[in-house]
Amino acid sequence: MTTAEPSKTVQAAFRDTAIFDLIAQEAERQRVGLELIASENFCSAEVRAAQGSVLTNKYAEGYPGKRWYGGCEVVDEVERLAIERVKQLFGAEWANVQPHSGSSANLAVYNALLEPGDTVLGMDLAHGGHLTHGSPVNFSGLRYRVVGYKVNPETELIDMEEVRRLAHEHQPKMIIAGASAYSRIIDFAAFREIADEVGALLFADIAHIAGLIAAGLHPNALPHAHVVASTTHKTLRGPRGGVILSNDPEIGAKIDRAVFPGYQGGPLEHVIAAKAVAFGEALQPEFKDYAAQIIRNAQALAGAFQNRGYRVVSGGTDNHLFVLDLRPQGLNGTKATRRLDANDITISKSTLPYDTEKILHGGGIRIGTPAITTRGMKEADMERVADLIDRALKGEDVKAEVHAFAGSFPLP
């Protein structure tokens, strides 16, 4: 990887060459590599400029108009703008843009609406769920009694009848609809129907699909869920952070208190400004074109792997990601990741439904198209991407080809 020229430029501009040399190296890594981690993306120069602005200097504990510190007139307007834009984006009546991450947003939801020991029904991690949906090593699994629902062993789709059966059997206080490695449409209306049957709250975690929902390409969770949380990066293409939405003002008030003073102090107003920029970008007509291309690319790439004899979990994808089962190839997620990393192709290993492989390794890999779509790749390019990954998984050295191919697509 060539880093000499960026390094010289950086050294001339900054005194702390140790850090800025590393930043230059990371910029070059991103430029010449293929980024296929489903939860990563490339945000715009305007998003990065807002996040790197003087707003980082301002402490602003509290909420707009109700701050602990003085001098918050400007950041109040920044935060109000972020709130109004995200409400417009998702059709929400209330929003909190202060959570530092998606996990922080989920923590606030739980703290606001649950008591320790309450029963929660969420998607099993091995079947596509998320750590914060009740994993025993996460706060969500340690603090609450969690019951996991799974996908159907034959279709590998969420088994809504099992969700209903478990809900009636365990009477959860909350049902979580959302995933981190599930490639199909989530039926939020069906989840709400089940939640109403047992008197449960419905919490939708849309972190992965938020950009697709914003573009109208996946059903919106908000008309059905009592509360919705998301990250602001991934398919939304903003800075790393979290956001919480609801149409219930009482729930909103509880969550506001859970965020501040519950577990956060000063919000990161420079990040909130970057969120506002990203929300504004997602409100533009061209964002729908971008989101549609993400899905087309994911479907084309999944098809290219199927044509090469790979098994795609659930047989395809309706969103931005899919999971490859690598057990027939004699690989697991850890081995595959190492081979791809050696060729500057980045993916994430993934567990598989009903897999016996240790969860640390996973039986497959999760592949996502948001980042390569941001760089301008189209369906025709997915054949080349699949070819490079296929050959790298078989042990070939394709790094030079990856650099030449990826480097021909600009970063924002």
Curated annotation (Swiss-Prot):
- Quaternary context: Homodimer.
Q: Does the keyword Secreted apply?
A: no
The species this protein was found in: Deinococcus geothermalis (strain DSM 11300 / CIP 105573 / AG-3a)
Q: What is this protein called?
A: Serine hydroxymethyltransferase
Tell me which InterPro entries the record gives: PyrdxlP-dep_Trfase (IPR015424), PyrdxlP-dep_Trfase_major (IPR015421), PyrdxlP-dep_Trfase_small (IPR015422), Ser_HO-MeTrfase (IPR001085), Ser_HO-MeTrfase-like (IPR049943), Ser_HO-MeTrfase_PLP_BS (IPR019798), SHMT-like_dom (IPR039429)
Q: Which gene encodes it?
A: glyA
Species lineage, top-down? Bacteria, Thermotogati, Deinococcota, Deinococci, Deinococcales
**Top-level division of the source organism's lineage:** Bacteria
Which Gene Ontology cellular component terms are annotated? Answer: cytosol
Please provide the record's keywords in A-Z order: Amino-acid biosynthesis, Cytoplasm, One-carbon metabolism, Pyridoxal phosphate, Transferase
Q: Which cofactor does it need?
A: pyridoxal 5'-phosphate
Query: What are the recorded GO MF terms, alphabetically?
Result: glycine hydroxymethyltransferase activity; pyridoxal phosphate binding
